[in-house]
Regions:
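Structured C-terminal helix/loop/strand segments within mature extracytoplasmic catalytic/sensor domains
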Residues: 2-23, 32-37, 183, 192-307
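Active-site-adjacent helix/loop patches that line small-molecule binding or acyl-intermediate pockets
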Residues: 3, 7-37, 94-189, 197
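Short, conserved catalytic-motif segment at the N-terminal edge
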Residues: 32-65, 81, 85
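Solvent-exposed loop/turn segments at secondary-structure junctions
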Residues: 46-48, 67, 109-110, 120-121, ...
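A short glycine/serine-rich beta->alpha loop
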Residues: 60-68, 99, 180
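Active-site SXXK
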Residues: 66-89, 102, 273
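Buried hydrophobic packing segments
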Residues: 76-83, 114, 191-198
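Short, well-structured active-site flanking segments
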Residues: 82-101, 111, 205-207
Length: 307
């Protein structure tokens, strides 16, 4: 188990000790669970603000690269926001609907459409020669943009692939590379930094692409019961009181179960929590993430943030 601090938050020793205990407790309920499979970034904020270094937090295995599944859609949403601000893309009803469906409903079809717009590439059969080289160059535009942001915590991440129900095929499969070496890859700190940007560093105007609004979750039990893909049940949101305000984006496939969440507790303390669970056994488990969130929330009810 490796603990790290990153530049966008201040390290809290108290939270670090608490997280160690929380993760140990959560893993103790299943003999097959190991802290080495889990990556966590946890940050507390006094209030919403636009200043870096405001949050206090901690992390475990938070530099470890894993397949992010649908967590990567946070990156694509932020890219769309910046493309629009730069005038590269025009804001339209269709674009708004695509980003909403990608973030709120986790639609892979919407994600595919958006990546086509962001990169000027399309899926299809394999191509060769100059066409193929140009295609790969274009598809890497999002990674180039991430690099140009010069955020230390984004170093080494790979966000250039579409998300699939039953793919990839053709040029998309070839772009994955030998042994899937070019699959998307993120760590919990990079996901946390992207979510922090969406939640507190963007000053949304009336006609902006409101990414934050697309991540808002409904915790009403009746609503959740009628939506089997609600990104709450089996994820962090399930472990939180139903009365809180929650924004989140989950990621789930046969190999992983992840979640990234932002909420406010009764003391107006803002919490950002990203948990990556890597392995088929976690993908099938629906109790681990809610337990982590419950323990973090209860700690925060007693927690006094440093000045």
């Amino acid at each position: 188990m490796i603990l790290h601090t990153m530049s966008f938050y201040n390290l809290s020793k108290e939270m670090g000790l608490a997280l160690n205990d929380i993760l140990g407790k959560a893993c103790s309920y299943n003999k097959d669970f190991s802290s080495e499979d889990i990556a966590i970034t946890w940050i507390n904020y006094k209030s919403e603000n636009k200043r870096v270094f405001k949050g206090f937090g901690t992390g475990i295995n938070n530099k470890k690269m894993v397949y992010p599944a649908s967590i990567v859609k946070l990156v694509y949403g932020l890219a769309a926001y910046h493309w629009i601000k730069k005038g590269i893309l025009l804001l339209s009803d269709e674009l708004i609907e695509a980003v909403w469906k990608m973030l709120s409903l986790s639609s892979n079809n919407a994600t595919s459409f958006l990546i086509d717009l962001l990169t000027g590439t399309t899926s299809g059969p394999c191509i060769e020669g100059e066409l193929w080289e140009n295609w790969k160059y274009q598809r890497s535009i999002i990674n180039d943009w991430l690099h140009d942001l010069r955020w230390e915590e984004l170093s080494g991440i790979n966000c250039c692939q579409k998300t699939w129900d039953d793919g990839p095929f053709g040029r998309e499969k070839e772009f994955y590379g030998y042994d899937n070496k070019n699959r998307n890859a993120m760590n919990s700190d990079s996901a946390a930094r992207i979510l922090e940007e969406i939640m507190i560093h963007i000053d949304y105007q009336k006609n902006d692409l409101n990414l934050r609004g697309f991540l808002k979750r409904n915790l009403n039990k009746v609503f959740l019961k009628n939506d089997s893909l609600n990104q709450i049940d089996g994820f962090l949101g399930e472990g939180l009181p139903k009365s809180i305000n929650l924004w989140s984006k989950a990621g789930l496939m046969s190999e992983v179960r992840h979640d990234s969440a932002w909420w406010t507790n009764s003391q107006s303390l803002h919490t950002l929590l990203v948990v990556f669970c890597n392995g088929e056994k976690y993908s099938k488990d629906t109790s681990f993430l809610p337990l982590i969130a419950k323990e973090v929330y209860e700690f925060n009810e007693r927690y006094t943030i440093e000045d």
